Amino acid sequence: MRKVKLAALQFSCTQEAKENIAKADQMAREAAAQGAQVILLPELFERPYFCQERKYGYYHYAKPVMENEAVLHFRELAKELQLVIPVSFYEREGILLFNSVAMIDAGEVLGVYRKTHIPDDHYYQEKFYFTPGNTGFKVWDTRYGKIGVGICWDQWFPETARCMALMGAELLLYPTAIGSEPILDCDSMPHWRRTMQGHAAANIVPVAAANRIGLEEVFPDEENGGQRSSLLFYGSSFITDE
């Protein structure tokens, strides 16, 4: 049986992309020093979760995969330390915008997965920013095994995990940005974990999720229609095999 060491990182995200990339770099190096070979980062970790509000100005965050700062940075880190790192980023492909992950294997970008399931409610307004993915589910044959990656809301749908398992995935990873549910007034964390434990048990494959942490607030202005809101991202990143 193949033995692989996996690290799931969680941290709060500031307004400065360079700060968030540097923080993720430091944590990834610390994990690698402890033997981690696969590093999982949270969803859209370059910035605060901008999908909490609607602003056209945020569209400029989207870049082609080989122009994204985080992808380029972690491509070099993965090459230096011989790591596998799926990097979540806001992707521009022509006139289309996607919530994507670039799978990096020791410096090589093996390909991109684009988020299939796009949430849309009062505080997770992703359909304003992202087109549903057109890649289909993907599994990559990396130096540390066959790895499939879903993105956040993908994890709620059993088809995501099952499709990747049927494609031969030995490990399923979910970069995530999930927190409080002000409209429902409930704690979704236990349900979130149990759902993915079910995916692991049903497909007989380890599953990991990396989530951000911290309170992120939106303040009213003309462009967001006077919205005032906040989300408390609860972290609770985990690795499970059942």
Task: Cite the ranges covered by each PLM segment.
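Residue-level detector of high-confidence beta-strand sites
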Residues: 112-114, 174
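Short beta-strand scaffold segments in enzyme catalytic cores
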Residues: 87-89, 100-103, 138, 237-239
